[in-house]
């Protein structure tokens, strides 16, 4: 299976069925925390939920539509990062991610996003990387700003997060801008 070493002790691995129990354990333990910025944790209550997610993700990967990876710190699954969409006609990918609360503040997301940006531009010949984050999700927005993304706009009423409608900040990074950093 596909793995990408971010740094010693941190790697990204294409999702596989063996990760389902670890995803379930994290989401069960941190459902309230994750539900602040993600709609799906409220429904992620079984191993079958994650097996289905992994099966869809692998199918979409095979079709060239997305790339979904488990974030592994040491041998422990700590989160998820992906090219949510790979748009060949626009030469653009959208990156999404989430991380267990106990692993926040260690730079794991910033380093992982940076690695996927490199991959998007060098291996996939993309011209743009985009990230969408809830306006109030300051840690996620700081990742974008730290890595040189530009705020391209705010989409109002963008997502219903478990009964709370939120606006999204859309960040973009061009291949040219990345090369200049």
Predicted regions mapped to residue ranges:
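Generic recognition of well-ordered alpha-helical segments
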Residues: 52, 56, 115-118
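A short helix-loop-beta-strand connector motif used in the catalytic cores of GNAT acetyltransferases and
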Residues: 41, 55-69
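Generic, well-ordered alpha-helical segments
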Residues: 15, 26, 42-49, 63
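Acyl-donor (CoA/ACP) binding surface of acyl/acetyltransferases
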Residues: 1-22, 26-33, 68-181
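Conserved GNAT-fold acetyl-CoA-binding loop/helix
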Residues: 35-55
């Amino acid at each position: 299976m596909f793995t990408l070493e971010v740094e010693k002790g941190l790697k990204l691995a294409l999702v596989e069925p063996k990760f389902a129990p670890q995803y379930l354990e994290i989401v069960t333990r941190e459902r309230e925390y994750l539900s602040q910025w993600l709609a799906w944790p409220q429904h992620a209550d079984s191993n079958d939920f994650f097996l289905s997610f992994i099966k869809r993700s692998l199918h979409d990967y095979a079709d060239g539509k997305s790339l979904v990876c488990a974030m592994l710190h040491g041998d422990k699954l700590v989160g998820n990062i992906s090219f949510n969409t790979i748009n060949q006609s626009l030469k653009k990918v959208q990156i999404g991610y989430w991380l267990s609360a106990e692993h926040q503040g260690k730079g794991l997301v910033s380093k992982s996003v940076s690695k996927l940006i490199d991959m998007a531009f060098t291996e996939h010949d993309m011209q743009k990387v985009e990230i969408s984050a809830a306006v109030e999700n300051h840690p996620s927005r700081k990742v974008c700003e730290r890595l040189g993304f530009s705020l391209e706009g705010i989409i109002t009423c963008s997502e219903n997060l478990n009964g709370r409608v939120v606006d999204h900040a859309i960040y973009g990074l061009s291949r040219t801008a990345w090369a200049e950093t």
